[in-house]
Amino acid sequence: KSGEVLIQVKGAGINNTDINTRLGWYSKKITGETNTVEIESENGSWNGIPISFPRIQGGDVCGNIIQVGEGVDSTRVGERILVRSMQNSPASKNSWAMQTIGSEFDGGFAQFCVAKSNESFPVNCDWSDIELASIPISYSTAEGMLCRADIQKEKILITGASGGVGSAAIQLAKLRGATIIAQCSPDKASALKELGADHTVNRYDDLIQVLGMNSVDAVVD
């Protein structure tokens, strides 16, 4: 369609967003006290609009543009790109409303997928397609939290630090000069220190007892 590009998928990440979408976890009916599997929800999408089927999941997409739609510069053919996972939703007049690839429209668990040209960004680096496909959702989520808290050189605690978002937050916070305490299982502590964590704490320990009151400037949770 006009303004879109056809992408040959070279790498697609798998993360909790894909699992949570299948469970209906993003439904407005789900709360902190809700057991997801006990709720039958028709509005399990990010924007509250029922997901239409069939649907191809895959929110993290790396690939090459092989065709362009009307209005898209033909020189984009051949570009290696990453697709922005969360995009402005045409179904809403609210500027903050969004749609997510692999949820409201088809994603990257296929040989080919379609995306808006202005949501497909050229990448020029020596990372593999698989490495690049790990970036969009986890790193954008972590970056959003760090920006919202304006993290710079503060001392921070990152919970769930061994997951995709947590490990991304470690690396991004380190680039900002933060001192990082990562909460994780003991067997994952050394790996997180290699990523940039200054200290680790056992996920099963009492944090106040181990760290003390008012011991960090911010918690990235």
Task: Pin down the residues of each PLM region.
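N-terminal Rossmann-like NAD(P) cofactor-binding module of classical short-chain dehydrogenase/reductase
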Residues: L82, V219-V220
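NAD(P)H dinucleotide-binding glycine-rich loop of Rossmann-like/cofactor-binding domains
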Residues: G44-P54, V83-G160
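Glycine-rich beta-strand-centered segment in the early N-terminal region that forms part
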Residues: K1-A12, Y26-Q87
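Cytochrome P450 core scaffold surrounding the K-helix E-X-X-R motif
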Residues: T17-L23, A91-S92
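Short amphipathic alpha-helix with an adjacent loop that forms part of the alpha/beta core around
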Residues: Y204-V216
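Local beta-strand N-terminus motif with an aromatic residue
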Residues: A110, K153, A197, S215-D217
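Mid-domain Rossmann-like dinucleotide-binding core that forms the NAD(H)/NADP(H) cofactor-binding site
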Residues: W127-D205
